[in-house]
């Protein structure tokens, strides 16, 4: 009698687990995207983007939603398709290709070391997500000229409204915020390319 009770309990537990898995919504994955359009005057210099540092609280696969001044929610079914720091550096590099008119833009994380005429380092201090409201980015960045170490440090603070309450609209708003930062960085690169030692 005891084995039959145990096996019935096990079957019930398995049935509950299967039902829970079957009812869970599918995960959705998002990326940031390039926003710039070609058209900048061509440049011949090269740029290396990275490293990019982000706050530990958002350095997660889940999209982290700000729900109050001291509270966040992890969106289990709405996730970034790749690590957020890599996502940001990739999109900044793609934007700089268009904004600077050069294809000689590479990522610091590449396995093959690349020496660029300029190095861009970014420290993201705020990366807030509020679906149906806005995406907020606050970042400090440094552009350093390789030949003499001359540098320019700047800060980009931007709040981009979302088009609707969807996470796709949130990712698009974050992409626009990263584009605004890319514009600031491109301006600093161009200024340093013209500056005398």
PLM regions: where:
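Short secondary-structure boundary motifs at beta->alpha junctions and helix caps
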Residues: 72-81, 147-184
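Sec-dependent bacterial lipoprotein signal peptides
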Residues: 1-21
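Surface-exposed short loop/turn segments
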Residues: 22-43, 99-147, 162
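C-terminal/domain-edge helix-coil "capping" segments
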Residues: 22-29, 37, 99-100, 162-197
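A structural "domain/chain start" motif
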Residues: 21-85, 192-197
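Generic beta-structure capping elements
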Residues: 50-52, 63-68, 140-142, 146, ...
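Mid-chain, structured segments of secreted extracytoplasmic proteins
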Residues: 74-104
């Amino acid at each position: 009698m005891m084995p039959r009770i145990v096996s019935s309990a096990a079957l019930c537990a398995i049935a509950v687990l299967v039902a829970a898995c079957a009812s869970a919504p599918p995960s959705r994955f998002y990326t940031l995207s390039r926003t710039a359009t070609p058209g900048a005057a061509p440049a011949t210099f090269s740029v290396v983007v990275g490293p990019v540092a982000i706050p530990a609280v958002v350095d997660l696969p889940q999209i982290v939603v700000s729900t109050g001044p001291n509270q966040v929610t992890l969106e289990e079914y709405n996730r970034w398709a790749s690590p957020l720091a890599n996502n940001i550096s990739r999109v900044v590099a793609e934007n700089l290709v268009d904004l600077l008119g050069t294809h000689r833009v590479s990522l610091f994380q590449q396995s093959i070391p690349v020496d660029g005429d300029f190095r861009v380092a970014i420290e993201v201090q705020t990366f807030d997500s509020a679906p149906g409201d806005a995406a907020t980015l606050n970042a400090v960045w440094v552009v350093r000229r390789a030949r003499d170490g001359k540098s320019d440090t700047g800060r980009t603070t931007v709040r981009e409204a979302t088009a609707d309450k969807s996470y796709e609209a949130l990712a698009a708003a974050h992409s626009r915020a990263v584009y605004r930062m890319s514009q600031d960085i491109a301006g600093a690169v161009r200024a340093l390319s013209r500056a005398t030692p």
